Amino acid sequence: GGGSGGVRAARMAAQRGARVALAETLGTDGLGGTCVNVGCIPKKLYSYAAHYAEAAEESHGYGWEGPAPVLNWPTLKANRAKEISRLNGVYSNLLRGSGVTVLNGFAHLQAEHQISLSTLHADGTPGHQTFSARHILIATGGTPHVPHFVGREHVITSNEIFDLPDFPQRLVVVGGGYIACEFASIFNGLDAHVTQLYRGEQVLR
């Protein structure tokens, strides 16, 4: 895994003289895991964008005049992607500078000290490589899970919401945890009509 934990562990081990390889599927997401690609960092960028709308509204009381600003969703998405790509490169350079070999592929535990790496060749055909090590650290992180129910095809998770083709004018957020509250707040600030559903009496419990 090439998230925050895997990258840090790989660098620390390499700096102490170990020969280290890190396996990560580098497709739509790069190094850095959830936090960098679909978590903390992009959420902060979108949160900042939402704050500007409120600041613009308050500015009239301080003498600022002119038409209200309009959100350009494609620009926000493009600038977010640009910043995430920059951070992916920072992680890559840190690993390279520490002497870590990055393996692009999906790793499967094959034996106690062995993994099988599933890769795709340039022509699209699948490939497999085997690697052995005295120590194998599992730092795979997690992904959102959507249960099976009628209408499931209309559901997105916190992973997909950053890159929707069109800005959602109406949004229903299910849940009362910090991720749900953050996105409800962000998209409300970006001027979407947001409804938040929660089965309990108090959010953020």
Predicted regions and their residues:
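N-terminal Rossmann-like FAD-binding beta1-loop-alpha1 element of flavoenzymes
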Residues: G1-L22, V173, I179-G189
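Glycine-rich flavin
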Residues: M12-F167, G200-L204
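Rossmann-like NAD(P)H-binding beta-loop-alpha module
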Residues: H154, P165-R199, V203
